[in-house]
Amino acid sequence: TCALPILLHDVSVIAFFRPDHGYWGAQMLEPYVDEEVSWAIRMHQALRFFPDKSVGYEYPEVYAKRFGDDYQVEPYVQRDYEIARNHKWYMSARMICLNDLYTFDPDVKVDIEDFEDIIGRHFKQPEEGLGNDSSPAAHMWRTLRRPANAL
């Protein structure tokens, strides 16, 4: 379960939402993955702003450059951090943060084909196809597929 949220957590950033991408990504994926996976994706949004020296997670330098050293998170982010840090799936969300830093390193090359088996075994693809099912997230996948659709 741990690898899947790491692989999928930025789906909404790639798609269309940068702000609150963890919340959007979790909602997009929730109907198709185990609850722990969507929870981890949602909560990494908050955890990424808070160091955890016990697992070797420091506040990312790229965040300090982007947001500034004195950046204060929004109250909802602080609240979700407090919820997540004592949750049984804390490390699933924290592992996203620990492994996310590789995406900021231009020297790290990752080939998605290496992970197709993991995704295929754990992602519950609807028979009708993403966006064609009746899940609460179907409209997001339709928008992703056709962002310029007039109606």
Description of each model-found segment:
Residues 1-4:
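Short, small-residue-biased leader/transition segments that mark boundaries at the very start
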Residues 17, 31-39, 43-151:
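Divalent metal-dependent phosphate-bond-processing catalytic cores, especially two-metal-ion Mg2+/Mn2+ enzymes
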Residues 10-14:
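Catalytic glutamate of the conserved HExxH
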Residues 15-31:
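Post-HEXXH active-site segment of zinc metalloproteases
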Residues 9, 21-25, 43-44:
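Histidine-centered active-site/metal-ligand motif
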